[in-house]
A protein has these predicted regions:
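Alpha-helical transmembrane segments of multi-pass membrane proteins
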Residues: 13-226
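Single conserved hydrophobic/aromatic residue that forms the stacking wall/gate
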Residues: 1-11, 224-233
Length: 233
């Protein structure tokens, strides 16, 4: 019947849109934008905001523990705050996912990207030094956590846009499997991870070089590397 044909067409359209959303959030172009942003943010927070990592929480925990052992509690707090903010960012991203995953007029990843852009914009207006850096680093780490929690695949491969250790492990694991099995898809998989690591290194290098010259306003440049919300569905 005509009604059944219309329902069939609608179902096909919905499936097509669902595939399109998935593809847009897993493309190499989006991966490049997010990963460059991840490298830039780490460089900015380290060189401009008191040698704190906005992404690499393992490094923050190592430094925090060192200062705790030395009895320098104020300096230890300097590294504890971004760790807690990162954890909170993951929680917020997951809550937004649960709340908006079934909403039709907007995709939950669009909300994540918009929130991240707002947080980074606020950081750009926070003065440098002292207690201001505590706030800036907390907001940056929260934004980074929301990003890494929300964008976890590129071309169907799990990856991290704000750190390298997992990507490096997956790359070398895929090469080892390729040498053992000979499946070329494993070689392509390893190249995907090496590309991600290279892009992160480029972002960190650019951030490390230019954040020292531009200063606090450099974080606002990240808004130009952030993907448009409409490209993250």
């Amino acid at each position: 019947s005509r009604r059944q044909r219309q329902m069939c067409i609608r179902d096909r359209y919905d499936k097509m849109m669902l595939r399109s959303r998935k593809q847009m959030s897993e493309t190499n172009m989006l991966m490049i934008l997010l990963t460059i942003s991840g490298g830039l943010q780490d460089a900015y927070s380290y060189f401009v905001r008191g040698e704190v990592f906005s992404n690499a929480q393992t490094g923050n925990i190592v430094l925090m523990s060192t200062y705790v052992a030395k009895g320098n509690w104020h300096r230890a707090l300097h590294y504890l705050i971004p760790v807690l903010a990162f954890a909170m960012g993951i929680f917020i991203a997951e809550r937004l996912h649960a709340r908006f995953k079934d909403v039709g007029f907007i995709h939950w990843r669009q909300i994540i990207v918009f929130t991240e852009m707002v947080l980074l914009c606020i950081v750009g207006f926070i003065p440098l030094g002292g207690s201001y850096d505590f706030v800036a680093n907390a907001l940056s780490s929260c934004a980074c956590a929301m990003q890494v929690q929300s964008f976890r695949k590129v071309n169907s491969y799990p990856y991290a846009s704000t750190m390298c250790i997992g990507n490096m492990r997956s790359a070398m694991e895929s090469i080892s499997a390729y040498m053992r099995i000979g499946d070329k898809s494993l070689l392509r998989k390893s190249l995907q991870y090496f590309l991600t690591i290279f892009v992160f290194a480029c972002g960190a290098g650019i951030g490390g070089a230019y954040s020292l010259y531009i200063g606090n306003e450099f974080i606002c440049c990240l808004l130009y590397t952030s993907p448009s919300p409409r490209d993250t569905r």
